[in-house]
């Protein structure tokens, strides 16, 4: 996932989506609480969010798949990704111990996702 390609960005978001989905299944009670899955999912989110801004190269500022607002607000964009990573690391350090804890963690992480997507994601039809 180097070079900041469109495919690399999609692959990273899919990793976060998969990890979030695994946490969501536990939070909703669709899957039993499993500390290893929670740990793995939070680790994936923390590491992937940290790497995500590196996939945006200002030299690719003509890429139609990239919202131009990212270039205008690169520090904010990076800060939003860093907050998601930090919040996932914090959750990892205080590992949610049950379904409710996973749900509360997801609310925090989901807020980070929403804030960045609202500001920077290009809506597809």
Curated annotation (Swiss-Prot):
Query: Which GO MF terms does the UniProt record name?
Result: electron transfer activity; heme binding; iron ion binding
Q: How is it modified after translation?
A: Binds 1 heme c group covalently per subunit.
User: Record-annotated residues binding heme?
Assistant: 13, 113, 116-117
Alphabetical GO biological process terms: electron transport chain
Alphabetically list the UniProt keywords.
Electron transport, Heme, Iron, Metal-binding, Transport
Q: An example Gene Ontology cellular component term from the record?
A: periplasmic space
Q: Where does heme c bind?
A: 13, 113, 116-117
Pfam (any one): Cytochrom_C_2
| Classification via InterPro entries | Cyt_c/b562, Cyt_c_II, Cyt_c_prime, Cyt_c_prime_subgr
- Asked if the Swiss-Prot or TrEMBL record annotates the protein with the keyword Protein transport, the reply is no
Q: What does this protein do?
A: Low-spin monoheme cytochrome c.
The record's note on quaternary structure and interaction partners says: Monomer.
**Name of the featured protein:** Cytochrome c-556
* Protein source organism: Agrobacterium tumefaciens (strain apple 185)
């Amino acid at each position: 996932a180097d070079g900041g390609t469109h495919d690399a960005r999609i692959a990273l978001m899919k990793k976060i989506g998969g990890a979030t989905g695994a946490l969501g299944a536990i939070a909703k009670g669709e899957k039993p609480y499993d500390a290893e899955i929670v740990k793995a999912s939070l680790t994936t989110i923390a590491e992937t969010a940290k790497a995500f801004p590196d996939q945006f190269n200002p030299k690719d500022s003509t890429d139609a798949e990239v919202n131009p607002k990212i270039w205008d607000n690169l520090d904010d964009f990076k800060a939003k990704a860093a907050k998601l990573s930090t919040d996932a690391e914090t959750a990892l350090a205080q590992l949610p111990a049950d379904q409710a804890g996973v749900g509360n963690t997801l609310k925090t992480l989901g807020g980070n996702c929403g804030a960045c997507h609202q500001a920077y994601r290009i809506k597809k039809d």
